[in-house]
Amino acid sequence: MVLSPADKTNVKTAWGKVGAHAGDYGAEALERMFLSFPTTKTYFPHFDLSHGSAQVKDHGKKVADALTNAVAHVDDMPNALSALSDLHAHKLRVDPVNFKLLSHCLLVTLAAHLPAEFTPAVHASLDKFLASVSTVLTSKYR
């Protein structure tokens, strides 16, 4: 999915508002995903998946850091996310549908925390951005 210049601006502005909360929002999105889509828990058998667990918080920060990297390299996401794509495709073997589920939960989390900034245009831009990230992460599955 191609991001327009307006989409890129919307994503960078919205992610800038996330700021220091990125790790917390990442963890909250993971918790939402585990509660809403319990089958996603199978990829984390070694995690304590209870609310507020240190492992979920740590992984939420990793998710947020990866998205921060993608925002910073929005014009070159395939190179910026190459190692992460390899990890998820070849080592972790995560079913690609899970990226869509996490993207949805992340959108819900952002909408809950940034209601004033989460306009229809920003929502659409973030959705396109997360779809692009998902596409990059699944590109090595082929």
Swiss-Prot record:
One of its GO terms (cellular component) is blood microparticle. It comes from the Eukaryota. O2 binds at H59. Residues 2-142 form the Globin domain. GO terms for molecular function: haptoglobin binding; heme binding; iron ion binding; organic acid binding; oxygen binding; oxygen carrier activity; peroxidase activity. Heme b binds at H88. Keywords: Acetylation, Heme, Iron, Metal-binding, Oxygen transport, Phosphoprotein, Transport. The keyword Transport applies. The modification Phosphotyrosine is found at Y25. InterPro entries: Globin, Globin-like_sf, Globin/Proto, Hemoglobin_a-typ, Hemoglobin_oxygen_transport, Hemoglobin_pi. GO terms for biological process: hydrogen peroxide catabolic process. The modification Phosphoserine is found at S4, S36, S50, S103, S125, S132, S139. The modification N6-succinyllysine is found at K8, K12, K17, K41. Red blood cells. The keyword Transport applies. The modification N6-acetyllysine is found at K17. PANTHER family: HEMOGLOBIN FAMILY MEMBER, HEMOGLOBIN SUBUNIT ALPHA. Heterotetramer of two alpha chains and two beta chains. Belongs to the globin family. Involved in oxygen transport from the lung to the various peripheral tissues. This is Hemoglobin subunit alpha. The lineage of its organism: Eukaryota, Metazoa, Chordata, Craniata, Vertebrata. The gene is HBA1.
